[in-house]
């Protein structure tokens, strides 16, 4: 049984070393650092998995590894067929082979050539990222010659190999690692590169919150014996949708889900691919699209045929960007979909100033409702202000949800649940089967412990608090000042407010007093009033006398 605590420590050390190497070469806090660190990490993971599988296959076939490498009796072809879900390597692409060339003057080119070969193998075509216009982006690029001057390249490559050799650490030991293990590693890998800065599609949902949202969604109905199609239209690095896939499979990743995503960010799409590869989700990689979801959605009822209409999904989960400048595409979004109900409540107008404040999340909510199958379920992270806004698109959306009886509940989260934004957030849970049921509104805003993360303050929910939120929602528990169950009619009476606090009972506290205590209280209040009245009269007298002393000078 592997020591996962030690494995995690070793993996994090390698990530730290790679970041330190970039720093000493003047690449710290640059886009090139992110590409180098994540690419080397991915190469190391895929290499070790290939070698581990090669050894396992040779043992099962009772042959030597050398016979498999040489493709004796077509053994290598049989190996590729057996492990078709993994990225294909040849032995010449491996760390074990390349270390034999460390002393050569052009070592870095040997390494980069291996990366390009891996990307170009026909077996690896499905591991490319596709853009909305059909372009394929490979697994690897030239991560050294593209970013470093010639004089530094060999030393840089040799340092990389000093960190990733198998005698220091072998990813093959993590073959049985579960999603929780890999999600922790993945979060550490990208923590410096995936900042929720407010720009489009750069949001990262904390793993614990993603897990809680996934649990609630899955427990909203019994899981059937089928493959569910699940979707995130603003996927970022995939935390939300992959936690949902894991929950649907009851910890057996991908057993119950086919994942579909789209995201405009190149960086986030790269991160998502790494996340998928760590968890062996090759079947869904072809559904990971880089592109503008609102302007050019990429998933259709008939694959590749936009005239067939947008594809609908069993589950949708999303933490969309709240505000960003999309003025350059706003009119196209409105015009192209005018004949449909995709944006039934409207598209935010372009303001004269502060275009970066355009509420793009309102378009994502409408897109999600449009893309959800009859009987489908969704979770959407929104700014808490959306719950009570009484004008414009916000209210129209809430009214549409309530009038169609699609709301299952809302959970209002503590402030600063995301370290890089102070915006208060809530999670809408949509259920198109909740026609006659009641709606549960949860106010979890007082939970959590405040901690310092860098220069920012963050609220961290304990596992006990997360379990309380999940259990309260799933079991529809009513708790004073925490959760309340309301009907659709009552929500209409409250102007379609989704805020739990507006439905809590107002409590008036009564204190039992004796006749003597009552008389004493009244006398105390009377004395205080008499004192205040006396002071008031004295002040009035002083002001009038001061006014009499004023003279007109000219």
Please give the residue ranges for each predicted region.
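Non-catalytic, mostly N-terminal accessory regions of nucleic-acid modification and defense proteins
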Residues: 1-212, 217, 221, 284, ...
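Non-catalytic alpha-helical coupling and interface elements of nucleotide-dependent molecular machines
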Residues: 41-45, 169, 190, 194, ...
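Soluble or luminal CAZymes and related metallo-dependent hydrolases
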Residues: 10, 264, 360
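Conserved S-adenosyl-L-methionine
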Residues: 200, 205-318, 323-327, 331-336, ...
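A short, mixed-charge helix-start or loop-turn motif at secondary-structure junctions
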Residues: 195-196, 254-255, 347-351
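Helical mechanochemical/support elements of P-loop NTPase systems and associated helical scaffolds
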Residues: 14, 29-33, 181, 185, ...
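A conserved structural/catalytic subdomain of Rossmann-like adenosyl-cofactor enzymes
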Residues: 2, 300-302, 307-554
């Amino acid at each position: 049984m592997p020591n996962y605590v030690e494995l995690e420590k070793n993996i994090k050390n390698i990530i730290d070393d790679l970041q330190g190497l970039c720093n000493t070469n003047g690449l710290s806090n640059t886009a090139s650092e992110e590409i180098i660190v994540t690419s080397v990490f991915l190469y190391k993971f895929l290499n070790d998995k290939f070698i581990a599988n090669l050894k396992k296959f040779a043992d099962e076939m009772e042959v030597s590894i050398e016979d498999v490498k040489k493709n004796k009796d077509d053994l290598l072809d049989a190996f590729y067929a057996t492990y078709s879900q993994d990225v294909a390597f040849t032995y010449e692409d491996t760390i074990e082979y390349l270390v034999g060339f460390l002393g050569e003057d052009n070592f870095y080119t040997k390494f980069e050539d291996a990366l390009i070969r891996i990307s170009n193998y026909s077996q690896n075509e499905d591991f490319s990222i596709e853009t909305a216009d059909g372009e394929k982006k490979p697994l690897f690029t030239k991560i050294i010659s593209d970013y470093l001057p010639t004089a530094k390249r060999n030393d840089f490559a040799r340092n990389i190999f000093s960190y990733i050799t198998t005698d220091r650490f072998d990813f093959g030991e993590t073959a049985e690692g579960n999603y929780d293990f890999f999600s922790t590693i993945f979060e550490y890998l990208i923590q410096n590169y995936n900042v929720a800065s407010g720009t489009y599609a750069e949001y990262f949902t904390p793993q614990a919150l993603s897990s809680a949202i996934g649990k609630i969604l899955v427990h909203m109905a019994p899981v059937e014996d089928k493959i569910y199609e699940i979707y995130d239209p603003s996927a970022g690095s995939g935390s939300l949708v992959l936690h949902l896939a894991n929950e649907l499979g009851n910890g057996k990743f991908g057993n119950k889900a086919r994942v579909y995503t789209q995201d405009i960010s190149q960086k986030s799409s790269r991160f998502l691919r790494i996340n998928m590869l760590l968890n062996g989700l090759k079947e869904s990689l072809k559904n990971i699209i880089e592109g503008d979801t609102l302007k050019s959605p990429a998933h259709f009822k008939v694959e590749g045929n936009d005239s067939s209409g947008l594809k609908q999904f069993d589950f949708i989960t999303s933490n969309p960007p709240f505000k960003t400048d999309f003025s350059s595409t706003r009119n196209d979004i409105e015009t192209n979909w005018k004949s449909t109900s995709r944006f039934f409540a409207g598209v935010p107008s372009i303001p004269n100033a502060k275009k970066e404040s355009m509420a793009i999340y309102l378009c994502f909510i409408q897109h999600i409702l449009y893309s959800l199958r009859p009987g489908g379920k969704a979770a959407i992270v929104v700014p808490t202000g959306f719950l009570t806004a009484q004008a414009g698109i916000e209210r129209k959306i809430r009214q549409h949800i309530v009038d169609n009886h699609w709301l299952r509940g809302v959970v209002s989260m503590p402030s600063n649940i995301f370290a890089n934004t102070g915006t208060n957030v809530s999670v809408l849970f949509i259920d198109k089967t909740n026609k006659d049921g009641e709606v549960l509104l949860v106010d979890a805003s007082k939970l959590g412990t405040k901690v310092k993360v860098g220069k920012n303050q963050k609220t961290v929910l304990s596992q006990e608090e997360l379990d309380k939120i999940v259990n309260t929602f799933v079991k529809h528990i009513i708790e004073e000042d925490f959760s309340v169950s309301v009907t659709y009619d009552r929500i209409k009476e409250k102007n379609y407010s989704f805020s739990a606090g507006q439905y809590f009972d107002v409590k008036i506290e009564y204190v039992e007093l004796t006749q003597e205590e009552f008389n004493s209280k009244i006398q105390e209040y009377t004395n205080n009033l008499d004192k205040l009245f006396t002071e008031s009269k004295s002040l009035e007298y002083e002001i009038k006398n001061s006014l009499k002393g004023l003279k007109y000078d000219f």
